[in-house]
A protein has these predicted regions:
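Catalytic core and acceptor-binding pocket of nucleotide-sugar-dependent glycosyltransferases
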Residues: 167-263
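Short His-Asn-centered micro-motif
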Residues: 43-46, 71-73, 122-124, 130-131, ...
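Extracellular structured ligand-interaction cores
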Residues: 39, 65, 121, 193-196
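N-terminal anchoring/stem segment of glycosyltransferases
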Residues: 1-102, 112-116, 219-222, 234-237, ...
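A residue-level signal for conserved active-site and pocket-lining positions in enzyme catalytic cores
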Residues: 42, 68, 110, 125, ...
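Short, solvent-exposed loop/turn segments at secondary-structure junctions
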Residues: 47-50, 75-77, 93-96, 126-128, ...
Length: 263
C-alpha cells in the first residue's frame, strides 16, 4: 500500500506542492541496486531512538548509484535488516554515551566503509529532495564538503550559544575554548553545520582530520560543531572553499525535520 500522507508534500518554487510516493521510490531504487556496485555510501546513525527511521524509509531523491546504510541500536530495525532503502547495521561503537556513540560513526567512515571510495553522512532528520547535493559535491571537487552554519560565522559565537543554552558541560566547553584561544584560532574564520558531510574518506588528510576531530569530541565537548572548524583551521582549510548554503535555506533540495528527542 502506498504511503500517501501529509509529510509527502513540500512547497516548490511556485508555492505549489509536489507529491511523491515513497513506496515507488523504494521499489525503483532497490530494483536498480541489484544491477550495480556502488562506490558511494550515504549513511546515518540513530542512537537511543533520537529519530525514527520508520518515518523516513527513503529520501525523496534516492541516488540510484549510492548505497544507503543506517547504524542503530534499535533492536526492531536491526532484526528487520532493511527499512525502505536503508540497510540496517548495529552500532560498531558503543563505549560512550548515546551522543558520542553517534559521533564515532559520524567521524569514522574510513573504518566503517573500506569497500567504498566516498561517503555522505547525513543527520537522520534530513530528507534529500533533489540531486543538488550530489551536483555541488562534484562541482566543489573537494574531498570534504559540508553546509554553512545557518547563523554563525565565528566559532567563538557558537561557544557562547552552546554555553547560554547549557547544551553541554560548562567545564568541558571552557577547557576546549581555551585550547582554541591558546592555539591562536582567529575569530570569524567561517563556520559550518555538520549535519551533512561528504568525504573521500580514504584520503590520508581526511582520515587524519577525522581522527583529530574524534579526539576532541572524546576529550572535550560532545558538540562536534565546537571542534571541526578548529581542525580545518589547523590544516589550512578555509570553510568558504568547501561549504554550500545551509540545508534549511535550500527548501527545494532538503527538508529538515525536528528531532524526535532532544540530545
Amino acid at each position: 500500500m502506498s504511503r500517501d500522507i501529509e509529510r509527502n508534500f513540500f512547497p516548490d518554487n511556485k508555492n505549489n506542492f509536489r507529491h511523491i510516493r515513497e513506496d515507488e521510490i523504494i521499489a525503483s531504487y532497490l530494483k536498480h541496486k541489484n544491477t550495480r556496485k556502488a562506490k558511494l555510501v550515504v549513511y546515518t546513525c540513530i542512537t537511543n531512538d533520537y529519530d525514527d527511521l520508520s518515518n523516513m524509509p527513503t529520501h525523496y531523491y534516492a541516488h540510484k548509484d549510492a548505497d544507503y546504510v543506517c547504524f542503530t541500536d534499535n533492536e526492531t530495525h536491526i532484526k528487520s535488516g532493511q527499512v525502505g532503502i536503508w540497510q540496517i547495521r548495529p552500532l560498531e561503537y558503543t563505549r560512550g554515551d548515546s551522543t558520542r556513540n553517534n559521533r564515532w560513526h559520524k567521524t569514522h567512515p574510513h573504518v566503517l566503509f573500506p569497500e567504498y571510495e566516498e561517503s555522505i553522512y547525513i543527520d537522520s532528520n534530513i530528507n534529500i529532495l533533489s540531486d543538488y547535493l550530489f551536483k555541488v559535491i562534484k562541482q566543489t571537487g573537494s574531498p570534504l564538503v559540508l553546509p554553512k552554519h545557518p547563523k554563525n560565522i565565528c566559532i567563538y559565537s557558537e561557544y557562547k550559544d552552546v554555553t547560554s543554552a547549557k547544551l553541554d558541560s560548562l567545564e568541558l566547553i571552557i577547557q576546549e575554548r581555551k585550547i582554541l584561544e591558546d592555539s591562536g584560532m582567529p575569530e570569524n574564520y567561517g563556520f559550518c553545520e555538520n549535519n551533512v558531510l561528504f568525504r573521500k574518506h580514504h584520503d590520508a588528510n581526511i582520515k587524519n582530520m577525522m581522527d583529530e576531530w574524534w579526539n576532541m569530541i572524546t576529550n572535550y565537548s560532545k558538540r562536534d560543531q565546537l571542534s571541526l572548524v578548529y581542525i580545518l583551521w589547523k590544516n589550512g582549510i578555509l570553510p568558504q572553499n568547501i561549504t554550500f548554503e545551509n540545508t534549511r535555506f535550500l527548501i527545494n533540495d532538503f527538508y529538515v525535520f525536528g528531532h524526535q528527542k532532544g540530545r
